[in-house]
Swiss-Prot record:
TM stretches of this protein: 334-354, 375-395
Chief location: membrane
Name listed for the protein in its UniProt record: Notoamide biosynthesis cluster protein M'
Source organism phylogeny: Eukaryota, Fungi, Dikarya, Ascomycota, Pezizomycotina
Originating species: Aspergillus versicolor
InterPro entries assigned to the protein according to its UniProt record, in alphabetical order: CorA_TM1_TM2, MgTranspt_CorA/ZnTranspt_ZntB
Gene Ontology CC: membrane
Gene3D superfamilies assigned to the protein according to its UniProt record, in alphabetical order: Magnesium transport protein CorA, transmembrane region
Entry-listed glycosylation sites: N51, N74
Sample GO molecular function, one term: metal ion transmembrane transporter activity
Membrane topology value: Multi-pass membrane protein
Length: 454
C-alpha cells in the first residue's frame, strides 16, 4: 500500500539534493521518495494549513512537535541529544522508531525545530497571523538532512533555497539550517514592523493636517473622526502583539545559540574538526538575535509614539469638549438676551415710531392726532436702508462659499476646455502651410480656412 503518498497533504512540495550544479530538483509531493532514500538530502515545503490536512500526516513527527502544528503558539525551539562512549550529538526522539507511519530515525539522528509567530498588519482592520516553522532531521554519521518547512509562500520558498548554507555546512552542522531559516523570518518581522510604522505615521501626519484651516468638513470626514479612537486602539493592540512576538523570537534565538554552545561543550573534539563552520553558524544566529533585539527596541519606541498620539488626541478632544460646553453656555446666554429683546422690541418700535415728528398729539381741541403729509419719507428711507443692511450681511456671511463655488466652476470649465482642445488636436491633421499657399492666400486666390474649437 502506498501509505505515505496517500497521506501526503496537497500543499507538499519536495526537493532533493542531486549534487549537480543545479543543486536541488523538484520531486513532486510523493512522500515515498523520502522514505525510500533517507541517505539523501530533502527539503519539504508544506504550504497548506496543516489543520486541514490528514491527521495521520502529523504522526510522522514527534509528539512534542505536534502542538507546534496544531496549537496557536508564539514561538518554540527544541533539540534532542544522543550520546555514546566517545561523543555527544543531537539525536532523534526514541519514539520516532515506534510509530509505523513515521520516518525511521536511527539513534544517531538529530531532530530539532524552531517556530516563530508573525502578525502582518495592512490596516487597523486588515491583518493576518503567520506561524512559520522548520523541522530538521539530521544524521550524525552521514550528515544527510530531511527538512520540513511550514508556512512559506512560493516567494519565501525561493528565497530560502537561495539562502541555504553550503553542503559542507549542512553536513556537519544542522544549526546552519536554523540560521538560514531565522534570517528569512527576521526579514518578515522587519517588514511587519514597517507596516505598523506606516500606520502610526499616517495618523501623525493626518493630525498635522487637521491643524491647518480648511473647508467645512464633509459628512464622511465627520464619520471618520468619530471612528478615529477605535482605529487608534486597534493599532495599539497590533503593536502589543508585535512586541510580544518579537520578544519571544529574540528568546528563541537566544536558546538556539545556547544549544549550539552546549553541543560544542559536550562534543568538543568533533566540533573542533569543523570549528570554522561552527563559528560561522553561531555568528549568523547571533546576528539574527541582534536584529531581533533591535526590532524589539524600535517596537517599544513605536508603541510609545502611538500612545503619545492617543494621549494627544484625547487632550484635543477634552479641549474641544470644553470649548463646546463654553459655546453652549454662551449660546444659552445669547438666546436669553435675544428672547428678552424680542419681548421689548415691538413696543420699542411702536413707541419710537409714534415719538417721531411725523406724529403730533394735540390736547386742545379734543385730544386729536396729527400726522404729517410727508410720512411716506420714513418708509422711503427705512426700507432701502434695511435691504442694504441685509445685503451687506449676506455678502459678508456667504463670501467664502461663493468664492469657493466660483473657483470650482472655473476649474471645471478649464478642465473641460483642456479636454476639448486635446480631442480637437488629436482629430486635426493639418497639411503643410508652404510658401505657395501663402501667395495664393495673399492674392485672395485661396480662401483662408479656419478651424474653431468650441
Amino acid at each position: 500500500m502506498d501509505y505515505a503518498a496517500e497521506r501526503a497533504p496537497p500543499g507538499v512540495q519536495i526537493y532533493m539534493d542531486v549534487g549537480d550544479p543545479d543543486g536541488w530538483r523538484y520531486c513532486g509531493n510523493d512522500m515515498n521518495i523520502v522514505e525510500r532514500d533517507q541517505s539523501a538530502n530533502f527539503i519539504i515545503f508544506v504550504t497548506s494549513d496543516i489543520n486541514d490536512t490528514d491527521k495521520s500526516f502529523k504522526l510522522r513527527f514527534q509528539e512534542e512537535f505536534r502542538p507546534v502544528l496544531d496549537a496557536d503558539i508564539n514561538g518554540s525551539f527544541d533539540c534532542h541529544y544522543g550520546c555514546s562512549q566517545s561523543r555527544v550529538w543531537p539525536e532523534g526522539s526514541p519514539e520516532s522508531v515506534s510509530s509505523p507511519v513515521m520516518f525511521v530515525v536511527s539513534n544517531i539522528a538529530l531532530v530539532s525545530w524552531s517556530c516563530f509567530k508573525i502578525k502582518e498588519v495592512k490596516t487597523a482592520e486588515d491583518y493576518s497571523w503567520k506561524q512559520p516553522t522548520i523541522h530538521v532531521q539530521w544524521n550524525a554519521e552521514t550528515g544527510s538532512q530531511i527538512v520540513h518547512v511550514f508556512g512559506f509562500n512560493p516567494d519565501q520558498q525561493s528565497v530560502f533555497m537561495d539562502k541555504l548554507p553550503t553542503a559542507a555546512e549542512r553536513k556537519c552542522n544542522p544549526f546552519s539550517l536554523h540560521a538560514a531559516f531565522s534570517r528569512i523570518i527576521l526579514q518578515q518581522y522587519d517588514d511587519a514592523f514597517w507596516l505598523l510604522r506606516d500606520l502610526v505615521r499616517h495618523h501623525e501626519k493626518a493630525r498635522s493636517k487637521e491643524k491647518k484651516p480648511k473647508r467645512k468638513k464633509s459628512k464622511a470626514e465627520k464619520e471618520h473622526e468619530r471612528k478615529i479612537f477605535p482605529l487608534l486602539h486597534d493599532i495599539a493592540r497590533h503593536l502589543f502583539h508585535y512586541q510580544e512576538t518579537i520578544e519571544v523570537a529574540e528568546h528563541t534565538l537566544q536558546v538556539m545559540a545556547k544549544e549550539l554552545l552546549n553541543w560544542r561543550h559536550e562534543d568538543g573534539n568533533n566540533i573542533q574538526q569543523n570549528i570554522g563552520t561552527w563559528l560561522e553558524t553561531r555568528r549568523r544566529i547571533l546576528h539574527e538575535e541582534k536584529r531581533a533585539h533591535s526590532l524589539k527596541t524600535r517596537s517599544k519606541s513605536l508603541n510609545d509614539r502611538h500612545q503619545n498620539e492617543i494621549n494627544l488626541r484625547q487632550a484635543f478632544n477634552l479641549v474641544s469638549q470644553d470649548f463646546g460646553r463654553d459655546a453652549r453656555s454662551d449660546s444659552n446666554m445669547m438666546t436669553t438676551v435675544a428672547f428678552v429683546s424680542m419681548v421689548y422690541l415691538p413696543g420699542t418700535f411702536v413707541s419710537g415710531l409714534f415719538g417721531t415728528n411725523f406724529f403730533s398729539f394735540q390736547a386742545d381741541p379734543g385730544n386729536t392726532w396729527l400726522t404729517a403729509d410727508e410720512f411716506w419719507m420714513y418708509w422711503a428711507v427705512t426700507i432701502p436702508l434695511t435691504l442694504l443692511t441685509l445685503g451687506v450681511w449676506g455678502v459678508w456671511h456667504w463670501w467664502d462659499t461663493y468664492v469657493g463655488w466660483v473657483q470650482k466652476m472655473r476649474d471645471k470649465k478649464a478642465k473641460s476646455t483642456k479636454s476639448d482642445e486635446k480631442d480637437a488636436t488629436a482629430d486635426r491633421n493639418p497639411e503643410p502651410f508652404n510658401l505657395r499657399q501663402r501667395i495664393r492666400t495673399a492674392t485672395r486666390l485661396n480662401e483662408i480656412q479656419r478651424k474653431e474649437t468650441v
